[in-house]
Amino acid sequence: MRVTNIYFSKIIKLENRLREFNFRKLPNTENKYHVDVTDDRGQRIMFTMYPDAEHMWHISASEVPQWIYYAQNILGQLIENETSSGVSN
């Protein structure tokens, strides 16, 4: 059995700043992704994203900055685009 590590990075503009989001598919899950990004002070923020039955992506974290919640749909679309293209680093 071969295990494939699926990961990719995307840069998007949020709150007038370019931010690099790193995505990594969690092993042994069908559709969960670990996501991390740095805040304005350089501290890494980590959270998990998963789709619901209607394929809407959600953030699974107790506390993340509001700007990440605002980007939830954008981040979900980035995951969908990347996985549908079949291309990863």
Per-region residue spans from a language model:
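Short, surface-exposed, low-complexity cationic segments
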Residues: 28-39
